[in-house]
Amino acid sequence: MTRPFNFSAGPANLPEEVLRQAAAEMLDWHGSGMSVMEMSHRGKEFISIYEHAEADFRELMEIPEHFKILFMQGGGLAENAIVPLNISRGGLADFVVTGSWSDKSQKEARKYCDVQIAATNESSAHTSLPPPATWQLRRDASYVHVCTNETIHGVEFQELPDLKALGSDAPLVIDFSSHVASRPVDWSKVGLAFGGAQKNLGPAGVTLVVVREDLLGHALAVCPSAFNYKTVADNDSMYNTPPTYAIYIAGLTFQWLKRQKEGEATGIAAMEKHNLAKAKLLYDAIDHSGLYINKVSKDCRSRMNVPFLLRDESRNEDFLAGAKARGLLQLKGHKSVGGMRASIYNAMPLAGVEALVSYLQEFEQKHA
């Protein structure tokens, strides 16, 4: 059976190899007689799965040893509270608001610390990014929060900001939920990174947190123990029962990522090349069209989430119906911005983008 191409923004498509391996191991993982879903999280079988997943993620992302990797629950939305509960010390936090997700983040953080919006792209309707040189950063801020890829508006920081160069000693907190593992990360610029797995790493249910060790141990007294980073780190993410099956699928995805090759590049470097090629193909098709529009500035277009509008919005339902008939699924844009959105995460093959581009051209010719 040929599977359709799923352009969902998340939960998103998973590598077919991963799904097939999980299916083969569903009833009996490696001769254990158990499904992973049935295992004790403290048994040797699951401990092996967890340790391999953590080691593979560290290797893939080239995460230095002075960072802890935590497998948590609650998704990126919960991290909007968990981060200030752990590292704000009840003080100041600066936020760069570039779309829906960073806006949600700053609103949530206000419950726990003094929030300042250091920069925003609201005047451009979230279609550009405020240059770092214009950010109004406070010298005594506990941290600076940036969403490095806005899933809804389709804007992405092509490089991480260098806070030290901007005169700030605050740790940079990045929400990389929707582009984690799509490109390398310069960890010298980062204090803490978090991301839900359900876009690029696995199913919903597990949240990856990468936190510098010096940021541990400063949680507010009201922080729930299950969300205290130091407690989670000290217990190897097993303080409470972790989302075992989601961690298992994420681990299979890490192994799949390690196998990726693009020329001489492997792993995340190969994935970045692959993602750049997919994004270029789709943006070129939109830009050379007379029917479709992408309003995001070219210097900050997301490689993962490509929103676009039809100039004649009365054709939207026809477009979506035709796409579904061709096996191109979940292209409807977010309700807050309308139009269409193609999410082309790591697991989306080039063939999927080629099929979408072919349909874009076919639909335009039909309705020219």
Curated annotation (Swiss-Prot):
Cofactors that this protein relies on: pyridoxal 5'-phosphate
Organism: Polaromonas naphthalenivorans (strain CJ2)
Protein name as catalogued: Phosphoserine aminotransferase
Principal location class: cytoplasm
Known partners and oligomeric status: Homodimer.
Cofactor-binding details, from the entry: Binds 1 pyridoxal phosphate per subunit.
The keyword Glycoprotein belongs to this UniProt entry's keyword annotation: no
Pathway: Amino-acid biosynthesis; L-serine biosynthesis; L-serine from 3-phospho-D-glycerate: step 2/3; Cofactor biosynthesis; pyridoxine 5'-phosphate biosynthesis; pyridoxine 5'-phosphate from D-erythrose 4-phosphate: step 3/5
Enzyme class: transferase
Chain positions recorded as pyridoxal 5'-phosphate binding sites: 101, 151, 175, 198, 240-241
Reactions it catalyzes: O-phospho-L-serine + 2-oxoglutarate = 3-phosphooxypyruvate + L-glutamate; 4-(phosphooxy)-L-threonine + 2-oxoglutarate = (R)-3-hydroxy-2-oxo-4-phosphooxybutanoate + L-glutamate
Localization of this protein: Cytoplasm
PROSITE patterns membership: AA_TRANSFER_CLASS_5
Family matches, as Pfam families: Aminotran_5
GO molecular function: O-phospho-L-serine:2-oxoglutarate aminotransferase activity; pyridoxal phosphate binding
Family: Belongs to the class-V pyridoxal-phosphate-dependent aminotransferase family. SerC subfamily.
Known function: Catalyzes the reversible conversion of 3-phosphohydroxypyruvate to phosphoserine and of 3-hydroxy-2-oxo-4-phosphonooxybutanoate to phosphohydroxythreonine.
